[in-house]
Amino acid sequence: MPWIQVKLNATSENAEQIGDMLMEETGALSITFLDAKDTPVFEPLPGETRLWGETDILALYDAEADMDFVITQLKASRLLEEGFAHKIEQLEDKDWEREWMDNFHPMQFGKRLWICPSWREIPEPDAVNVMLDPGLAFGTGTHPTTSLCLEWLEGLDLEGKTVVDFGCGSGILAIAAIKLGAAKVIGIDIDPQAILASKDNATRNGVADQIELYLPQDQPEGLIADVVVANILAGPLRELSGIITSLVKPQGQLAMSGVLDTQAEDVASYYAEQFDLDAIVEQQEWCRISGKKK
């Protein structure tokens, strides 16, 4: 069935209030917030909804909804300036699942590593292939931070090594490490959903018996590894630098991402005393910081 979409421009101060009003008072089926001016949002606090200075609101209604009523309610709310601009358009129904699946293709990292959705044919059956579908937790290889970490892992000799994936998300880095030769991987994440997603993806890839998964409070005492990869955010990389450093054996390797180019030098300074750091690698304004422990 067709749908009707209303598009409005708001600010970070009133966007949530407008969205709530549209849901509660006009029967909107869903509300989407979009960046109106290509402005990045950095690291919201836990439980916080961080919005752009100028935010587009998309409200979706069924085809029978009374748009005159919706606009009247918006005017009456006084949440927007008088004469506010808006756009109403009809959206034809689509096979959204098929369209979503069509957007994901096998991706190559380095010379031998591929990340493949399960519904696609594997391009190189003899390569190192990780089967991973977009799902509940962050990390499918499409984001530059994940890509930077995968390329780094692919370039290491992981044969027989122990690896810690700190902030394992979907488990993509942990699974890739096993497929690239690591003997054992320990995945750690603060989100129980990420632990479940990692476990499910490890099972799909036939490596569940080689990956241990823990919430931070449950991880083994004295945990130490040859290789540690932490694809999280700049704030936690600073705050947890002592913990992350302690996970790396002397002469072990560390890589971190989830860091913007404007944050990279500052984050690196937290590790410079304990590590011989490599040159910072950048991809689409995201960075990887890596090095060997002294």
UniProtKB/Swiss-Prot annotation:
Keywords, sorted A to Z: Cytoplasm, Methyltransferase, S-adenosyl-L-methionine, Transferase
CDD domains named in the record: AdoMet_MTases
Protein family: Belongs to the methyltransferase superfamily. PrmA family.
Principal subcellular localization: cytoplasm
Binding site for S-adenosyl-L-methionine: T146, G167, D189, N231
SUPFAM superfamilies: S-adenosyl-L-methionine-dependent methyltransferases (SSF53335)
Pfam family, any one: PrmA
Protein name per its UniProtKB record: Ribosomal protein L11 methyltransferase
Gene Ontology terms, MF aspect: protein-lysine N-methyltransferase activity
GO cellular component: cytosol
PANTHER family named among the record's database cross-references: ELECTRON TRANSFER FLAVOPROTEIN BETA SUBUNIT LYSINE METHYLTRANSFERASE (PTHR43648:SF1)
